[in-house]
Amino acid sequence: MLINRIEKDTIGEVELPKKCLWGSQTQRSIYNFNISTEKMPYELIHALVQIKLVAAKVNKDLKLLEEKKADAIIKASEEILSGKYKDSFPLVIWQTGSGTQTNMNVNEVIANIAIKLLGGKYGDYSIIHPNDHVNKSQSSNDVFPTAMHISAVLSLKKNLLPNLIKLKKSFYDKSILFKDIIKIGRTHLQDATPLTLGQEVSSWYCMLKKNIKYIKNSILCISEIALGGTAVGTGLNAHEKYSLKASKLLSEINKHNFISSTNKFESLSTCDAIVKVHSTLKNLSISIMKISNDIRWLSSGPRCGIGELIIPENEPGSSIMPGKVNPTQCESISMICCQVIGNDSAIGIGGLSGNFQLNVFRPMIIYNFLQSVRILSDGIKSFNKKCVIGIKPNIKRIKKFLKESLMLVTSLTPHIGYDKSAKIAKLAHNENITLKEACLKLNYISESQFDILVRPENMIGNKN
């Protein structure tokens, strides 16, 4: 593409492609920050465009922006929101920490689309100006934090929570299906007293149920938006009614109650709300990683591991060992959880690094946040569909381990005491005999008493 359009800004002239929709500040960012490939997430761009649309409507309503200009900005914003012009937002996240260059990228693209709608030529900002008209009543310092919160809320509600709720249901269904299957428990990776497979799976269901609650509750933190605070939180150059009107419109568009922050100084100077919400994603990752590790252990084998669960065979597992099948979905979701936990560290460091009236680590913070939501959403969907739904019990293996377990001796403790019960277990283990044989050899109780007292079905509490 030939570089044959000249634009001027407050620093000087800038050359850029003739037909591109962005302007000088975007082009300068392309030149100055040619760093890696991490582009600004489109979810954030979408939220920024929503804000521009709402700002134009409010400014028009308050008689702060000429109707003709406002309508052109609104129309241009609607076209972008419909899915057009996605390639007009080329900037990477490694830019100014306030997100100013991305805010200006959006301003310039909307301005040029609006200019064209009004019959002008790209770059003729006397018709529609990126700052004076598209960015009216706004600052990057309140717009970018607002877009962060909007994109975060929508990604959680539309992507993560629906997939997480489906996974929770799958575990609930399995817990009911497996409620009559008695198996041996394990603590410290050693044999323990029995429980049902349904009870074991119910703990996974309950973990997800609690995590869903944590995430839903935390969304309230990011439902407050900074819009109207402008540069440092005072609301300079914004109408006193602007923030409330804009919040109301954003709520209507997104079918979510966004409220104007009561203290915009805090909203601009910190990323505490995003940090808080992402901590729930870290917590979720810790829970899912525990669940996936349990499934990996329980399905290990098929002959020399635990092998109590049978997982779907999705693909060959080895390039050298024929017939091998690996728990690949568990491995995939575990890696995702590791990444989210790492993202949480980066977000936390970014959050504590804001100085005075503005946090300037925002592009990195929101990139990591949205990446966490995206990979968790996709990973959970895949884990559920390709693994969890297809999990089956290996009844033969489960019965074998239950029969051989030494920890069934625990049921004798109330009747013969801890020390004698321990002697039975040790003798059975050392001589490779059954608990019953060891008990009779030590002459602690009769065979009939043993059969009455050592019954796994009486050791599992409420199996429902």
Swiss-Prot record:
For the protein in the UniProt heading, the enzyme class is: lyase
Q: Name one Pfam family in it.
A: Lyase_1
Q: Which domain of life is it from?
A: Bacteria
State whether keyword Lipid biosynthesis applies.
no
Q: Identify the catalytic residues.
A: 188, 318
Q: Which reaction does it catalyse?
A: (S)-malate = fumarate + H2O
**Could you give a single Gene Ontology term from the biological process aspect?**
fumarate metabolic process
- Which keywords are on file for this protein? Cytoplasm, Lyase, Tricarboxylic acid cycle
Classification via InterPro entries: Fum_hydII, Fumarase/histidase_N, Fumarase_C_C, Fumarate_lyase_CS, Fumarate_lyase_fam, Fumarate_lyase_N, L-Aspartase-like
Q: Where is this site: Important for catalytic activity?
A: 331
**Which parts of the sequence bind substrate?**
98-100, 129-132, 139-141, 187, 319, 324-326
**Annotated EC:** 4.2.1.2
Instruction: Quote one Gene Ontology molecular function term.
Output: fumarate hydratase activity
Q: In which pathway does it act?
A: Carbohydrate metabolism; tricarboxylic acid cycle; (S)-malate from fumarate: step 1/1
Write out the GO cellular component annotations.
Answer: cytoplasm
Localization per Swiss-Prot or TrEMBL: Cytoplasm
Stated family: Belongs to the class-II fumarase/aspartase family. Fumarase subfamily.
- HAMAP family (alphabetical): FumaraseC (MF_00743)
Oligomeric form and interacting partners: Homotetramer.
- Further facts: There are 2 substrate-binding sites: the catalytic A site, and the non-catalytic B site that may play a role in the transfer of substrate or product between the active site and the solvent. Alternatively, the B site may bind allosteric effectors.
Instruction: State what this protein does.
Output: Involved in the TCA cycle. Catalyzes the stereospecific interconversion of fumarate to L-malate.
The protein's name: Fumarate hydratase class II
Query: Taxonomic classification, please?
Result: Bacteria, Pseudomonadati, Pseudomonadota, Gammaproteobacteria, Enterobacterales
